[in-house]
Amino acid sequence: MTIARRPSCHAVENSIGLAAPAEAVFDYVTDVRREREWNPQLREAEKLTPGPVGVGTRYRVRFGRGVGAAIIENTAFDRPRGWSAVSTSRRLDVRFRGQVTGLPGGCQLGVQTELSPRGALRVFSPVLRQLMRRSWDKDLAAIKAIIER
């Protein structure tokens, strides 16, 4: 999967190499119910749609740090290469793309997060972008530690 759209100035891109098969990494990171294992900001995640994870899968989630409740929906799903999702909340909408590239001995996990803050939160866009970049660096390191156990 390639990222066709050019990211806005509010987009954050992060990546990490993993010593694990692309399929295992993809399956782990695309199931939002498992995100609490590596994202300390996620408090709750409930899958709202029946069946396997794929396009149209929706989750109700609750984050800490002022984001609160959100609905996440997968908008593209190309196992094990890439996926896209949107998250809608009262204060912040997020467009997300993930890409898993197979490499000798493992894979590369890349994520792109595009933030669309609402209302007064818009003035904090540069700060939000920096927080998101740091948060993804920590989250990717946690994913790596879990996957490579």
What are these regions (language model features)?
Residues A24-V29, E35, Y59, N74, ...:
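Hydrophobic pocket/interface hotspot
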Residues E13, R33-A69, F77-G82:
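Short beta-edge strand/loop motif at the mouth of beta-sheet-based domains
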Residues A19-E23, P50, T75-P80, Q99-Q108, ...:
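A short, structured loop/turn motif at beta-sheet edges
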Residues M1-T49:
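Hydrophobic ligand-binding cavity/cleft-lining segments
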Residues C9, R65-V67, R91-D93:
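Glycine-centered tight beta-turn/hairpin loop motif at sheet-sheet or coil-to-beta transitions
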Residues N14-I16, K47, V61, A70-A76, ...:
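Hydrophobic/aromatic beta-strand elements that line small-molecule binding cavities or substrate pockets
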Residues S84-K138, I143-A145:
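Beta-strand/loop substructures that line and gate deep hydrophobic ligand-binding cavities in soluble
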